[in-house]
Amino acid sequence: MNKGELVDAVMAKATVTKKQADAFILALDIVA
């Protein structure tokens, strides 16, 4: 795995995590 692939993998994971966080916050807003 070269550096570019590693960066891509980290960015992809960060994007998924942010989407999950946004969805979680949205769900809290709906419940509240």
UniProtKB/Swiss-Prot annotation:
Name this polypeptide is given: DNA-binding protein HU
Something else known: The heterogeneity suggests that there are probably two distinct DNA-binding proteins, as in E.coli.
Alphabetically ordered keywords of this record: DNA condensation, DNA-binding
Molecular function terms, GO-annotated: DNA binding
Stated family: Belongs to the bacterial histone-like protein family.
Source organism per UniProt: Synechocystis sp. (strain PCC 6701)
Keyword DNA-binding: yes
Function, in words: Histone-like DNA-binding protein which is capable of wrapping DNA to stabilize it, and thus to prevent its denaturation under extreme environmental conditions.
Tagged with keyword Transport: no
One Gene Ontology biological process: chromosome condensation
